[in-house]
Swiss-Prot record:
This is Acetyl-CoA acetyltransferase IA. Coiled coil: none annotated. Belongs to the thiolase-like superfamily. Thiolase family. Keywords: Acyltransferase, Peroxisome, Transferase. The lineage of its organism: Eukaryota, Fungi, Dikarya, Ascomycota, Saccharomycotina. It comes from the Eukaryota. It catalyses: 2 acetyl-CoA = acetoacetyl-CoA + CoA. A motif (Microbody targeting signal) lies at residues 401-403. One of its GO terms (cellular component) is mitochondrion. Pathway: Metabolic intermediate biosynthesis; (R)-mevalonate biosynthesis; (R)-mevalonate from acetyl-CoA: step 1/3. One of its GO terms (molecular function) is acetyl-CoA C-acetyltransferase activity.
């Protein structure tokens, strides 16, 4: 049975800031609202009161405040009547938000849905668990919220990077393989930046100056400019001291950012005279043993491709979130994705990985790739802690449509 079409009519994202870097003064809701405002500004036919709901991803929610997605919506100027849902599927949160938004349109409960995700990893607090019951005597332990709720496998009680080391060993990828993948990610991202490939998707952020200092406009992803090939090759391994392969430079970083997409039904597309950028053709989700989350996209991507009525060889470009270089390498090998079709503008190793944002960000970038490099079908996939993964297939509708 053919499903009713769901169209992407606008996308936008913030630049991605480094940990404690250029965007660290902004909260989750600041980052999300900026992306939402920018996406809606590109489609003036859609008035704030026309938007039925917002579905927004966010992982590190401690101290963010009640109902984070609702905060994003109201800060972006959407009306009090907006229905808001916050999604936490770890790194796949932003993509799950896109899937839910599309499903709601297909079900007929909404016609216009703003979807996406954000994360301010810089502002995630430390926890003091013993304070609730009273730390009556002696030292009290502080818990890093980023690590506890974002980067730690709760079943093995080991960091995500240890799982990446397991993946490298299981699939035979060396330190050199991962370093070369990371170097290529940085070089592709640097080339895309220098050629202006990200301009259509990035909404520059103005950071207010203080104590007489001028405002600062952040226009580019902060991590890309930090690339140093020699330092990357000489970096120490982080998660496994002896015979380890995963380093800080060949893994994604801790980051801040937000991304948003505007989805509409076919009826609303025609009623408002909107020009579609792409159609959401299918999606797939899968899960396996929690500590093997790194290769869960190898299950989700084929499911999404099948759901869209395609085969992998018909897909023009792929975006796989580079939580670690080995994630890109292993899943490309398992799904038979040619590396020349993968992350052609670089990935999270070079650009950064704000957890709740990334699943939406890679769809935004995938659409940029399809638009500027001449493709029709694209697949975005992302693994998530706990053993899961999500994937989305999009089809470029109009080669002349501008982002």
């Amino acid at each position: 049975m053919a499903l009713p079409p769901v169209y992407i009519v606008s996308t936008a994202r913030t630049p991605i800031g480094s940990f404690q870097g250029s965007l660290s003064s902004l909260t989750y809701s600041d980052l999300g609202a900026h992306a939402v405002k920018a996406a809606l500004a590109k489609v003036p036919q859609i008035k704030p009161q026309d938007v039925d709901e917002i579905v927004f991803g966010g992982v590190l929610q401690a101290n963010v405040g009640q109902a984070p997605a609702r905060q994003v919506a109201l800060k972006a100027g959407l009306p009090d009547s907006i229905v808001a849902s916050t999604i936490n599927k770890v790194c796949a949160s932003g993509m799950k938000a896109v899937i839910i938004g599309a499903q709601n349109i297909i079900c007929g409960t909404s016609d216009i849905v703003v979807v996406g995700g954000a994360e301010s990893m810089s502002n995630t607090p430390y926890y003091l668990p013993s304070a609730r019951s009273g730390a009556r005597y002696g030292d009290a332990i502080m818990v890093d919220g980023v690590q506890k709720d974002g980067l730690l496998d709760v079943y093995e009680e080991k960091l995500m990077g240890v799982a990446a080391e397991k993946c490298a060993k299981d699939h035979g990828f060396s330190r050199e393989d991962q370093d070369n993948f990371a170097i290529n990610s940085y070089k592709k991202a640097g080339k895309a930046l220098s050629e202006g490939k990200f301009k259509s998707e990035i909404a520059p952020v103005t950071i207010k100056g203080f104590r007489g200092k001028p405002d600062t406009v952040i226009e580019n992803d902060e991590e890309i400019g930090k690339f140093n090939e020699e330092r990357l090759k000489s970096a120490r391994t982080v998660f496994q001291k002896e015979n380890g392969t995963v380093t800080a430079p060949n893994a994604s970083k801790l980051n801040d950012g937000g991304a948003a997409l505007v989805l509409v039904s076919e009826a609303k597309l025609k009623q408002l005279g909107l020009k579609p950028l792409a159609k959401i053709s299918g999606w797939g989700e899968a899960a396996r043993t929690p500590f093997d989350f790194t290769i869960a996209p190898a299950l989700a991507v084929p499911k999404a491709v099948k759901h869209a009525g395609l085969t992998v060889d018909r897909v023009d470009f792929f975006e796989l979130n580079e939580a670690f270089s080995v994630v890109g390498l292993a899943n490309a090998e398992l799904v038979n994705i040619p590396l020349e079709k993968l992350n052609v503008y670089g990935g999270a190793v070079a650009m950064g990985h704000p957890l709740g944002c990334s699943g939406a960000r890679i769809i935004v970038t995938l659409l940029s790739v399809l638009t500027q490099e001449g493709g029709r079908f694209g697949v975005a996939g992302v693994c998530n802690g706990g053993g899961g993964a999500s994937a989305v297939v999009i089809e470029k509708i109009d080669a002349d449509a501008k982002l």
